[in-house]
Amino acid sequence: MQALKKQSLTRDGLEFVRDEPEPRVGHGDVKIRVEAASICGTDQSIYHIIDRPGMRDEMLVYNGGDVSRYQPIIIGHEFCGEVAEVGEDVDQGLCRPGDYVTAEMHISCGFCQQCRTGQRHICRNIRVKGVHMDGAFAEFVVVPSDNVINLERFGGRDVIPPRIGAFLDALGNSVHTVMEGNVAGKTVAILGCGAQGLMATAVARTLGATRIYVTDFSGKEGAARLANRFETAKELGADFCFDTNETASPRQKDELLERVGTERGGGVDVVLEMSGAEAAYNDAGAMVKNGGQILLLGIPAWPLKSFDFGKYAVWKGVTIRGIFGRRMFETWYAMLDLLASEKSGLKARLEKIIAREAVPLSDFERGFELVRKQEAVKLLLTP
């Protein structure tokens, strides 16, 4: 079968292969024919592994940290497809061949304290398909039956088409983050205007945030490129957008802090940090009101050195919470119900961030480049 593999953690790039053996189905597994998959930031980090030592170390967690023992894997963890085969122990009420499905690609152990107390999303022994074991950038992927999400129960392709079904994993991160903030009737700041930040903007607007501030740092690409992202953010529901690069956009950061300071409470109720940029953490502390919440989904490329906990957490009485993955499976049900509801408007908002053209898996270099250049937010790959 066709597949996209990471062959080595000592060099950048990926390799497209045509002769990868199809995965075998275990007794409790489901084999899925991939219909569409989506490129995410994790995939980009795996592609550019030399500049992402944290990602390299994470991929080595399950073989003792020895790069010489690394086994090439198929990457990719956002996808949807059709059930091709089920193991003999799989309950037919869960799924059958031909069903339209996706899957939770975080594989939990089931026996640690977290798993046994309803917190499987932060399992101590978690493994991620496409990072630690073969993933979905291929014609077929095998997942444990417990992780299968049967989309037929939410209206199937008519309600959740593959162009959205392919990135439910990523959307779930944003839904989890926004829901932890209980944003209805609250002011919200979203730091980072990448895919996660834009999806969080759409979800926050859907769930009733009263005012939404979106920020990002224009970086080398310049303010003009970021301006396009800000236009998209406003289409998704943002009220205000600010470039925090004080060199490229003088006075915008000052204006942001002045405007946020006029909010009731002297800051926003909830900050969603979606970028992982070190500077954004202090921005979050400056923007949140006393007694507010900071929710962290973005993962820094390097250990943080400069967050002022005394000033921004202790003295403000702020609650800071890390967000990882999706609650299994509360986040999934909430997300799918929102998508299935025409009244929510979430599906229509998300259509604004999906590239019109799907890219064949064999042409993956072009797809990754489009995402890297921010010419696409969510781009689909098809085997």
Predicted feature residues:
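Rossmann-fold NAD(P)-binding glycine/threonine-rich loop
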Residues: 299-317, 335
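Glycine-rich beta-strand-centered segment in the early N-terminal region that forms part
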Residues: 23-37, 52-113, 154-155
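NAD(P)H dinucleotide-binding glycine-rich loop of Rossmann-like/cofactor-binding domains
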Residues: 65-77, 109-191
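C-terminal hydrophobic helical "lid"/dimerization subdomain
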Residues: 282-286, 329-383
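Adenosine-nucleotide cofactor-binding segment
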Residues: 205-281
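Hydrophobic/small residue at the entry helix of a nucleotide-binding pocket
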Residues: 173, 196, 204
